[in-house]
Amino acid sequence: VSYHVYTDNFFQYKDNNPISVFDARWQGCFSPSSKFTVTHSFYGRVLSGSGNYPFAIINMVGGTIPGRYMPQQIPFTGINRAELSQAALLVAGLNLRQRILKNQYISVMGSYGRNSGKFHQILDSSESVDMAGVGIGYMYKSFLGPVEIQLNWSNQTKKVGWYAGFGFVF
């Protein structure tokens, strides 16, 4: 959890209120058996202030790795690149991974989120946007690191996409 205030003169941002950013992230995993793992996550980021947010602060959603392209990027299944989002963004994710052979795994993953121009409107369906994404993946654990391929879809892209990865994420 973090909170930041952005100004351009220690008091204001562009002759308006300073920009406040509240950011919360939580991720956990558990293994009910030696071959099955459940990973769950929750991300939330809320901006408040003048409403004219610079690119370096504005919320971004998409990709598989948090903060890969911009520090404020929140991962989302089915959106394969970082996209701009509104001022209030909440995302929950779930990944079910099963080991099928010694070094081979399959995954089923999903994300659900809501975004809105203001935090107090995020549960109001007329003022916010529902986001949903699903995916399936295969991973091989090689001696050089994991090799992964994923097929995914979201109601934001409205098409099947894919992601391929090789190596560890640091």
Feature names for model-found ranges:
Residues 1-101:
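C-terminal outer-membrane beta-barrel translocator/porin domains of Gram-negative envelope proteins
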Residues 19-23, 87-91, 131-135, 144-146, ...:
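Transmembrane beta-barrel architecture of outer-membrane proteins
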Residues 25-27, 93-95, 135-139, 165-167:
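Outer-membrane beta-barrel architecture
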Residues 32-38, 102-106, 140-149:
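Repeated loop/turn-to-beta-strand initiation elements of outer-membrane beta-barrel proteins
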Residues 43-56, 62, 110-118, 122-124, ...:
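Outer-membrane beta-barrel domain signature
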Residues 91-93, 107-109, 148:
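Structured core elements
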Residues 97-131:
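C-terminal hydrophobic structural anchor segments
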Residues 138-145, 149, 158-170:
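Outer-membrane beta-barrel "beta-signal"
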